[in-house]
Protein backbone atom coordinates (compact mmCIF):
# COMPACT_ATOMS: atom_id res chain seq x y z
CA UNK A 1 0.00 0.00 0.00
CA UNK A 2 2.79 2.42 0.97
CA UNK A 3 4.66 1.48 -2.22
CA UNK A 4 1.58 2.20 -4.36
CA UNK A 5 0.97 5.49 -2.54
CA UNK A 6 4.62 6.46 -3.10
CA UNK A 7 4.25 5.69 -6.80
CA UNK A 8 1.12 7.85 -7.06
CA UNK A 9 2.87 10.65 -5.19
CA UNK A 10 5.83 10.54 -7.61
CA UNK A 11 3.41 10.61 -10.55
CA UNK A 12 1.68 13.63 -9.04
CA UNK A 13 4.95 15.56 -8.70
CA UNK A 14 5.97 14.57 -12.26
CA UNK A 15 2.61 15.75 -13.57
CA UNK A 16 2.99 19.08 -11.78
CA UNK A 17 6.45 19.45 -13.30
CA UNK A 18 5.32 18.53 -16.83
CA UNK A 19 2.36 20.92 -16.79
CA UNK A 20 4.22 23.94 -15.44
CA UNK A 21 1.81 26.61 -16.64
CA UNK A 22 -1.27 24.67 -15.54
CA UNK A 23 0.36 24.11 -12.15
CA UNK A 24 1.18 27.81 -11.86
CA UNK A 25 -2.39 28.77 -12.84
CA UNK A 26 -3.91 26.38 -10.29
CA UNK A 27 -1.64 27.47 -7.43
CA UNK A 28 -2.22 31.13 -8.32
CA UNK A 29 -6.00 30.63 -8.23
CA UNK A 30 -5.78 28.95 -4.82
CA UNK A 31 -3.38 31.62 -3.53
CA UNK A 32 -5.52 34.59 -4.56
CA UNK A 33 -8.67 32.97 -3.20
CA UNK A 34 -7.09 31.98 0.12
CA UNK A 35 -5.62 35.47 0.58
CA UNK A 36 -9.14 36.87 0.33
CA UNK A 37 -10.57 34.13 2.54
CA UNK A 38 -7.76 34.69 5.07
CA UNK A 39 -8.35 38.45 5.20
CA UNK A 40 -12.10 38.08 5.66
CA UNK A 41 -11.62 35.24 8.16
CA UNK A 42 -9.29 37.36 10.32
CA UNK A 43 -11.61 40.37 10.12
CA UNK A 44 -14.75 38.34 10.84
CA UNK A 45 -13.28 36.49 13.84
CA UNK A 46 -11.94 39.73 15.34
CA UNK A 47 -15.27 41.48 14.78
CA UNK A 48 -16.96 38.56 16.48
CA UNK A 49 -14.52 38.88 19.39
CA UNK A 50 -15.10 42.64 19.66
CA UNK A 51 -18.86 42.10 19.53
CA UNK A 52 -18.66 39.50 22.30
CA UNK A 53 -16.58 41.86 24.46
CA UNK A 54 -19.02 44.70 23.83
CA UNK A 55 -21.97 42.46 24.72
CA UNK A 56 -20.28 41.51 28.00
CA UNK A 57 -20.08 45.20 28.94
CA UNK A 58 -23.82 45.74 28.52
CA UNK A 59 -25.28 46.33 32.00
CA UNK A 60 -28.39 47.70 33.68
CA UNK A 61 -28.06 50.56 36.18
CA UNK A 62 -30.88 50.45 38.75
CA UNK A 63 -31.10 53.72 40.71
CA UNK A 64 -32.54 53.10 44.18
CA UNK A 65 -35.21 55.45 45.54
CA UNK A 66 -33.81 57.84 48.17
CA UNK A 67 -36.57 56.83 50.59
CA UNK A 68 -35.51 53.16 50.61
CA UNK A 69 -33.92 52.01 53.86
CA UNK A 70 -31.40 49.15 54.15
CA UNK A 71 -34.14 46.52 54.52
CA UNK A 72 -35.90 47.76 51.38
CA UNK A 73 -32.60 47.79 49.46
CA UNK A 74 -31.86 44.20 50.49
CA UNK A 75 -35.33 43.09 49.41
CA UNK A 76 -34.95 44.85 46.06
CA UNK A 77 -31.58 43.18 45.49
CA UNK A 78 -33.03 39.75 46.27
CA UNK A 79 -36.02 40.37 43.98
CA UNK A 80 -33.68 41.26 41.12
CA UNK A 81 -31.52 38.18 41.73
CA UNK A 82 -34.60 35.96 41.54
CA UNK A 83 -35.38 37.11 38.00
CA UNK A 84 -34.60 34.62 35.25
CA UNK A 85 -31.35 35.21 33.34
CA UNK A 86 -29.54 37.32 35.97
CA UNK A 87 -25.77 36.83 36.11
CA UNK A 88 -24.86 39.29 38.87
CA UNK A 89 -26.26 42.13 40.98
CA UNK A 90 -23.65 44.48 42.45
CA UNK A 91 -24.30 47.35 44.85
CA UNK A 92 -22.79 50.71 43.91
CA UNK A 93 -22.92 53.44 46.56
CA UNK A 94 -23.75 57.03 45.67
CA UNK A 95 -20.16 57.97 46.59
CA UNK A 96 -18.88 55.51 44.01
CA UNK A 97 -21.42 56.79 41.48
CA UNK A 98 -20.13 60.33 42.04
CA UNK A 99 -16.51 59.22 41.59
CA UNK A 100 -17.44 57.53 38.30
CA UNK A 101 -19.29 60.64 37.14
CA UNK A 102 -16.28 62.84 37.94
CA UNK A 103 -13.91 60.43 36.16
CA UNK A 104 -16.13 60.37 33.06
CA UNK A 105 -15.61 64.13 32.60
CA UNK A 106 -11.82 63.87 32.83
CA UNK A 107 -10.00 67.03 33.94
CA UNK A 108 -13.15 69.15 33.69
CA UNK A 109 -14.86 66.78 36.12
CA UNK A 110 -12.78 68.06 39.03
CA UNK A 111 -15.13 71.04 39.31
CA UNK A 112 -17.94 68.61 40.16
CA UNK A 113 -16.22 67.48 43.37
CA UNK A 114 -18.56 67.99 46.32
CA UNK A 115 -17.00 69.71 49.37
CA UNK A 116 -19.52 70.55 52.07
CA UNK A 117 -22.53 69.82 49.88
CA UNK A 118 -24.62 66.67 50.16
CA UNK A 119 -24.19 64.09 47.40
CA UNK A 120 -27.41 64.34 45.30
CA UNK A 121 -26.92 61.01 43.51
CA UNK A 122 -28.70 57.73 44.25
CA UNK A 123 -27.29 54.43 45.42
CA UNK A 124 -27.57 51.90 42.63
CA UNK A 125 -27.46 48.25 41.66
CA UNK A 126 -25.42 47.24 38.62
CA UNK A 127 -27.14 44.27 36.98
CA UNK A 128 -25.66 41.97 34.34
CA UNK A 129 -27.68 39.37 32.47
CA UNK A 130 -26.49 35.93 31.38
CA UNK A 131 -27.55 36.73 27.81
CA UNK A 132 -27.01 40.42 26.85
CA UNK A 133 -29.99 40.18 24.48
CA UNK A 134 -32.26 39.76 27.54
CA UNK A 135 -31.26 43.20 28.85
CA UNK A 136 -34.35 45.13 27.57
CA UNK A 137 -36.82 42.56 28.99
CA UNK A 138 -35.06 42.39 32.36
CA UNK A 139 -34.94 46.21 32.56
CA UNK A 140 -38.72 46.41 32.03
CA UNK A 141 -39.34 43.94 34.87
CA UNK A 142 -37.04 45.81 37.26
CA UNK A 143 -38.77 49.13 36.48
CA UNK A 144 -42.00 47.75 37.98
CA UNK A 145 -40.39 46.83 41.31
CA UNK A 146 -40.81 48.84 44.50
CA UNK A 147 -38.19 51.41 45.54
CA UNK A 148 -36.80 51.72 42.00
CA UNK A 149 -36.22 55.37 41.09
CA UNK A 150 -34.94 54.84 37.54
CA UNK A 151 -33.55 52.12 35.28
CA UNK A 152 -31.00 52.89 32.56
CA UNK A 153 -29.14 50.62 30.17
CA UNK A 154 -28.55 52.69 27.04
CA UNK A 155 -31.59 51.39 25.18
CA UNK A 156 -30.77 52.87 21.77
CA UNK A 157 -27.06 52.07 22.07
CA UNK A 158 -27.78 48.44 23.01
CA UNK A 159 -30.23 47.99 20.12
CA UNK A 160 -27.75 49.55 17.70
CA UNK A 161 -24.94 47.35 19.04
CA UNK A 162 -26.92 44.14 18.55
CA UNK A 163 -27.87 45.16 15.01
CA UNK A 164 -24.26 45.94 14.08
CA UNK A 165 -23.07 42.67 15.63
CA UNK A 166 -25.68 40.62 13.78
CA UNK A 167 -25.07 42.29 10.41
CA UNK A 168 -21.25 42.03 10.67
CA UNK A 169 -21.40 38.33 11.55
CA UNK A 170 -23.84 37.52 8.76
CA UNK A 171 -21.88 39.49 6.16
CA UNK A 172 -18.61 37.85 7.22
CA UNK A 173 -20.04 34.33 7.06
CA UNK A 174 -21.71 34.99 3.69
CA UNK A 175 -18.49 36.41 2.20
CA UNK A 176 -16.36 33.47 3.35
CA UNK A 177 -18.87 30.90 2.05
CA UNK A 178 -19.09 32.76 -1.25
CA UNK A 179 -15.30 32.94 -1.62
CA UNK A 180 -14.87 29.23 -0.84
CA UNK A 181 -17.41 28.23 -3.50
CA UNK A 182 -15.82 30.64 -5.97
CA UNK A 183 -12.44 29.05 -5.28
CA UNK A 184 -13.86 25.56 -5.80
CA UNK A 185 -15.29 26.63 -9.14
CA UNK A 186 -11.99 28.19 -10.29
CA UNK A 187 -9.89 25.22 -9.21
CA UNK A 188 -12.30 22.74 -10.76
CA UNK A 189 -12.10 24.51 -14.12
CA UNK A 190 -8.31 24.84 -13.92
CA UNK A 191 -7.83 21.15 -13.15
CA UNK A 192 -10.31 20.22 -15.88
CA UNK A 193 -7.93 21.85 -18.36
CA UNK A 194 -5.04 19.83 -16.92
CA UNK A 195 -7.00 16.59 -17.12
CA UNK A 196 -8.22 17.37 -20.63
CA UNK A 197 -4.59 17.67 -21.75
CA UNK A 198 -4.00 14.15 -20.37
CA UNK A 199 -7.27 12.57 -21.54
CA UNK A 200 -5.50 10.15 -23.91
CA UNK A 201 -3.35 8.89 -21.05
CA UNK A 202 -6.46 8.33 -18.91
CA UNK A 203 -8.26 6.49 -21.73
CA UNK A 204 -5.29 4.17 -22.27
CA UNK A 205 -5.06 3.39 -18.54
CA UNK A 206 -8.78 2.62 -18.50
CA UNK A 207 -8.54 0.35 -21.54
CA UNK A 208 -5.69 -1.74 -20.09
CA UNK A 209 -7.74 -2.50 -16.98
CA UNK A 210 -6.82 0.16 -14.43
CA UNK A 211 -9.54 0.73 -11.82
CA UNK A 212 -11.20 4.11 -11.43
CA UNK A 213 -9.56 4.69 -8.04
CA UNK A 214 -6.13 3.73 -9.37
CA UNK A 215 -6.57 6.45 -12.00
CA UNK A 216 -8.03 8.92 -9.51
CA UNK A 217 -5.24 8.67 -6.92
CA UNK A 218 -2.56 10.69 -8.78
CA UNK A 219 -5.11 13.44 -9.51
CA UNK A 220 -6.37 13.27 -5.93
CA UNK A 221 -2.82 13.83 -4.65
CA UNK A 222 -2.16 16.43 -7.33
CA UNK A 223 -5.18 18.46 -6.22
CA UNK A 224 -4.12 18.07 -2.59
CA UNK A 225 -0.62 19.34 -3.37
CA UNK A 226 -1.96 22.27 -5.41
CA UNK A 227 -4.21 23.28 -2.53
CA UNK A 228 -1.47 22.99 0.09
CA UNK A 229 1.12 24.82 -2.06
CA UNK A 230 -1.44 27.54 -2.78
CA UNK A 231 -1.91 28.16 0.95
CA UNK A 232 1.77 28.94 1.63
CA UNK A 233 1.74 32.61 0.55
CA UNK A 234 -1.61 33.43 2.24
CA UNK A 235 -0.35 31.90 5.50
CA UNK A 236 2.89 33.91 5.31
CA UNK A 237 0.89 37.11 4.70
CA UNK A 238 -1.47 36.38 7.61
CA UNK A 239 1.45 35.69 9.98
CA UNK A 240 3.40 38.83 9.09
CA UNK A 241 0.51 41.27 8.61
CA UNK A 242 -1.39 40.29 11.74
CA UNK A 243 1.75 40.65 13.85
CA UNK A 244 2.21 44.20 12.50
CA UNK A 245 -1.47 45.08 13.03
CA UNK A 246 -1.40 43.87 16.65
CA UNK A 247 1.73 45.93 17.38
CA UNK A 248 0.10 49.04 15.92
CA UNK A 249 -3.51 48.69 17.12
CA UNK A 250 -3.29 47.19 20.63
CA UNK A 251 -1.53 50.18 22.33
CA UNK A 252 -4.10 52.58 20.85
CA UNK A 253 -7.23 50.72 22.02
CA UNK A 254 -6.02 49.35 25.34
CA UNK A 255 -8.78 49.25 27.94
CA UNK A 256 -11.68 49.39 25.46
CA UNK A 257 -13.85 46.58 24.11
CA UNK A 258 -12.00 46.97 20.78
CA UNK A 259 -9.48 44.21 21.39
CA UNK A 260 -7.81 41.92 18.87
CA UNK A 261 -7.41 38.19 19.32
CA UNK A 262 -3.92 37.29 20.63
CA UNK A 263 -1.33 36.40 17.97
CA UNK A 264 -0.73 32.94 19.40
CA UNK A 265 -2.63 30.63 18.91
CA UNK A 266 -4.99 32.63 16.65
CA UNK A 267 -2.77 32.94 13.55
CA UNK A 268 -1.76 29.29 13.73
CA UNK A 269 -5.41 28.25 13.94
CA UNK A 270 -6.18 30.42 10.91
CA UNK A 271 -3.17 28.87 9.11
CA UNK A 272 -4.51 25.36 9.71
CA UNK A 273 -7.92 26.44 8.44
CA UNK A 274 -6.36 27.89 5.26
CA UNK A 275 -4.37 24.69 4.65
CA UNK A 276 -7.53 22.62 5.16
CA UNK A 277 -9.58 24.84 2.82
CA UNK A 278 -6.85 24.74 0.17
CA UNK A 279 -6.60 20.94 0.42
CA UNK A 280 -10.38 20.47 0.21
CA UNK A 281 -10.64 22.83 -2.76
CA UNK A 282 -7.84 21.02 -4.62
CA UNK A 283 -9.14 17.51 -3.89
CA UNK A 284 -12.73 18.42 -4.67
CA UNK A 285 -11.70 20.07 -7.94
CA UNK A 286 -9.64 17.04 -8.98
CA UNK A 287 -12.25 14.41 -8.17
CA UNK A 288 -15.16 16.24 -9.80
CA UNK A 289 -13.11 17.13 -12.88
CA UNK A 290 -11.91 13.61 -13.63
CA UNK A 291 -15.31 11.96 -13.23
CA UNK A 292 -16.48 12.35 -16.81
CA UNK A 293 -13.11 11.23 -18.24
CA UNK A 294 -13.50 7.85 -16.51
CA UNK A 295 -16.52 7.04 -18.67
CA UNK A 296 -14.71 5.45 -21.60
Curated annotation (Swiss-Prot):
Top-rank lineage group of the source organism: Bacteria
Annotated organism of origin: Bacillus subtilis (strain 168)
Residue ranges that the UniProt entry lists as topological domain Extracellular: 45-170, 240-264
Effect of deleting the gene: Cells lacking this gene and ftsE, the previous gene in the operon, delay sporulation onset, as a result of which they form a medial rather than polar septum at the onset of sporulation. This is presumably due to slower phosphorylation and activation of the spo0A transcriptional regulator. However, at later time points these cells undergo polar division and eventually form smaller than wild-type mature spores.
Predominant subcellular localization, coarse grouping: membrane
GO biological process assignments: asymmetric cell division; cell septum assembly; positive regulation of sporulation resulting in formation of a cellular spore; regulation of phosphorelay signal transduction system
Entry keyword set: Cell cycle, Cell division, Cell membrane, Membrane, Transmembrane, Transmembrane helix
UniProt function note: Part of the ABC transporter FtsEX involved in asymmetric cellular division facilitating the initiation of sporulation. May act as an importer, possibly at the top of a hierarchical cascade leading to the correct temporal initiation of sporulation. Acts upstream of the histidine kinases KinA, KinB and KinC, the RapA phosphatase and the Spo0A sporulation protein.
Subunit details: Interacts with FtsE. Interacts with FloT.
Pfam families: FtsX (PF02687), FtsX_ECD (PF18075)
Membrane-spanning residues: 24-44, 171-191, 219-239, 265-285
Protein name: Cell division protein FtsX
One GO CC term on file: plasma membrane
Family: Belongs to the ABC-4 integral membrane protein family. FtsX subfamily.
Cytoplasmic side: 1-23, 192-218, 286-296
Subcellular localization(s) per the UniProt record: Cell membrane; Membrane raft
Topological type in the membrane: Multi-pass membrane protein
